[in-house]
């Protein structure tokens, strides 16, 4: 297998970042970069969680900032600003061709995540992928 990195994120029973368990996985993943997935959005204080994830050594956080990127765009903007290039904030969760330009310009994020699934098909749509690519050039 060829691996470029790992995506995971462990929360404790209180839905806070489990420092020790994440630290163990990051150590096991070395030398590969790690991204914290959308479990981040379940924490009660995203700004504090941001600092914890940075301290752990994650390189990216996949987050919607709320239930989806539309609802969380102000939070995403705040997270990008507070990250100060110490970690990449990657908006994802409801990101489609219909909103990527707005989320891009509003948040100033540099990386984005989309499943490119439309019409509840459960499968990424090639036309949606190509449209997303054309909109973020």
Please identify what each model-predicted range represents.
Residues 41-56, 77-89, 95-110:
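Catalytic cores of alpha/beta
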Residues 1-13, 58-72, 107-129:
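Glycine-rich phosphate-binding active-site loops on the catalytic face of alpha/beta enzymes
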Residues 35, 44, 49, 64, ...:
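Generic serine detector
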């Amino acid at each position: 297998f060829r691996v470029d990195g790992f995506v995971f994120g462990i929360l404790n029973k209180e839905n806070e970042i489990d420092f020790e368990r994440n630290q163990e996985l990051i150590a096991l993943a070395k030398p590969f970069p790690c991204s914290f997935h959308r479990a981040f959005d379940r924490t009660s204080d995203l700004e504090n969680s941001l600092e914890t994830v940075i301290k752990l050594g994650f390189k990216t956080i996949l987050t919607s900032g709320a239930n989806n990127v539309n609802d969380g765009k102000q939070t995403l903007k705040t997270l990008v600003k507070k990250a100060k290039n110490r970690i990449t904030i990657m908006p994802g969760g409801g990101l489609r061709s219909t909103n990527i330009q707005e989320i891009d310009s509003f948040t100033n994020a540099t990386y984005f995540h989309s499943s490119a699934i439309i019409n509840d098909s459960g499968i990424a749509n090639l036309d949606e992928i190509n449209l997303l690519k054309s909109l973020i050039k």
